[in-house]
């Protein structure tokens, strides 16, 4: 089985465009320049579009001061894990789902999570940066997302091709969701 690499995903995206492939990340070509420019954004967007099994994490959250103005809705504030890309669910005592929202801390330096859970377990998508951790289906979806972002600068705003690429990406999401979801069976939550 071929090891997933950043260059392999870049070249797959370039192939979707019908563009020239590249041999190294630091090439001084329009294709390599655009791939470097859009790579992180495409990766984060594709990770946020679905809770991919390989990127799911759980963490007990560390409490921080509740910002003023939220006392009527929430009782507790928590710092998010460092690599948290998207929060999916907060569970009180690790079991019962609780409503939550994200807000800025009073200094405006970080995003915090507000909830009524006194002991909060967060289910979240981690910002996975290393290609060797990606599964094949995600790598394919990421290449499609990257192709969507590369289309305008490399194809000189060919609107028809851009729309086609975005449609292919969107149409592939349900299949990816079905395939990825078939690999997990969550435990039922206890009756309250």
Report residues per predicted region:
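A generic secondary-structure signal for well-formed alpha-helical elements
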Residues: 13, 17-21, 46, 50, ...
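Short coil/turn segments at secondary-structure boundaries
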Residues: 25, 54-60, 187-189
């Amino acid at each position: 089985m071929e090891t997933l690499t950043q260059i392999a995903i870049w070249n797959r995206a370039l192939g979707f465009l019908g563009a020239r492939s590249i041999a190294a990340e630091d090439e001084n070509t329009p294709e390599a320049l655009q791939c470097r420019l859009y790579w992180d954004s495409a990766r984060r967007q594709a990770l946020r579009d679905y809770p991919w099994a390989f990127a799911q994490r759980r963490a007990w959250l560390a409490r921080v001061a509740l910002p003023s103005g939220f006392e009527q809705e929430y009782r507790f504030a928590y710092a998010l894990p460092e690599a948290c890309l998207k929060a999916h669910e907060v569970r009180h005592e690790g079991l019962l789902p609780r409503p939550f929202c994200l807000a800025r801390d009073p200094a405006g330096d970080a995003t915090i999570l507000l909830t009524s859970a006194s002991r909060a377990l967060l289910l979240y998508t981690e910002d996975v940066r290393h290609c060797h951790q990606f599964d094949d289906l995600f790598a394919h979806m990421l290449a499609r997302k990257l192709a969507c972002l590369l289309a305008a600068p490399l194809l000189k705003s060919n609107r028809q091709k851009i729309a086609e690429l975005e449609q292919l990406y969107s149409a592939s999401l349900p299949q990816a969701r079905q395939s990825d979801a078939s690999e997990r069976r969550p435990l039922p939550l206890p009756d309250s």
